[in-house]
């Protein structure tokens, strides 16, 4: 066969298959049978196998992506991929509409309603109609380049075609990759038949497929892409509404979710929500709600964005999903400060998109409140990413042999006595750092980012070092360099890893008194309290010598916390560890003359979504002026700073007559004290 004839035949088959793909996936109107489609596909594949040098870049057979990658490259999003706010009931939905319509006075607002697909959000870049890059959402600012994997998705166009519209020079399309229910069921059946691990839900299957370094694995999975929006288009597409944008995307070859509704009122949106909820079991894909968007693109621009989400859209989530299961056992876990937490081991149950087999019961008081026993039938609830919880016990199903749960008398890890001071809800192991569970959690806390910030000393290192008996307490961290040969013998720990760890430990020796106090893991002492203690006592020696009465005078330190701090510094073992840490070279700058702190001791509350700054920035400015930032409003609150969507805290402030300040006024006040956004 002549070369030109081969290439021409390949081109004809590619165009024909693309046309039928569009009819099947996008228009949902198949024009040929599956067997006819397979015949065309295999005809093209046979030609390509015979003449591999003439395989075309946009061939559907090349969607099996090539060589496996060693890692995914990071990519910064030109337009951030923001998340959506959530509403969970009609009242919240109507409040969202009020906020929208108050910002668009005297304008008619229409809402575009779409299915909220339960998949993995990605961004696709096309240059002159050719797919050049696919990137995961990541943290919204930076994602991972998964181009090879997205090219394997069968319904995703690699080259854009349209008889109606001109193909833009640059186009960035956002959408969701997911696995339809039928494909998910078949995949799990195949996995089970091969004796391999099955997937908990379609979303996990889709996400796991896209994160395979070998694109051939992704190609074998039944993935689908559904477009939901346009991030960039050059030249501008000239479209004026969200609804038209979605239709335009279908003309270019993209598939969109199987239902969209244009609603003239928020009441109509609520009706569609109820309709979709009824139809949910019959849909081809998993959804966890619907997305409500202001339809007019100019109105979207007018509304703008909050710091992390658009004002013109929200996700209307479905109610919690529940399932019945039985409690097989209740175990007790020991935390960093010795707290004993009961954990119910359940007969595994699929609820809210995941298989749940463990649920925390928080404390013995919660066990008594629920009257939950080993062997009981319970209702487990879960919504979205919320941690599953036991909502109800069904005593009518209780077996005769059901066991009442008692607080253990001794620690399940070290056998030290369990204590529960009068008036407290939490029981604790009295073993301190003698208890292995407390020791490992204490070390994890000590090295964490907000404490000593020892980069690279993660859980795998800590567990290995504990097994080798190189870490008996946190002070041993600063002697690890003496065991270099032992460290090199740890699996997957090469010369570079060991040196990086030693360097990070050395770098952590220069810190601040506040960080050091926080790192000690004293019960009741968080970041804010540690900062207050450092400001008040100025030196470690003064803090160690302080009695309960002196400690109680520190802002943010109550009677009980003062006793916990005093007890910590009275324990001989703790003093020994402190002395070894200081001897190892941990140090901080000597205290300077106190700076002006006009808000010293005042309690401030931040509520709502802040637009002009982050909560961390606002907190840092307040703390620099001596104030403490509280999570709740009380009669002692000096002022409340309210952003968007401020709720119950704002109402409580009004009832108590607490002053309320908006962001602009707050920033002006801070500027007057010399505090500005950095």
From Swiss-Prot:
Q: Which NCBIfam families match?
A: dnlj, PRK07956.1
Report the PROSITE patterns cross-referenced here: BRCT, DNA_LIGASE_N1, DNA_LIGASE_N2
What are the names of the required cofactors? Mg(2+); Mn(2+)
Q: What class of enzyme is it?
A: ligase
What protein name applies here? DNA ligase
Question: What does UniProt list as catalytic?
Answer: 116 (n6-amp-lysine intermediate)
- State which Enzyme Commission number(s) the record gives: 6.5.1.2
Question: Which chemical reaction does it catalyze?
Answer: NAD(+) + (deoxyribonucleotide)n-3'-hydroxyl + 5'-phospho-(deoxyribonucleotide)m = (deoxyribonucleotide)n+m + AMP + beta-nicotinamide D-nucleotide
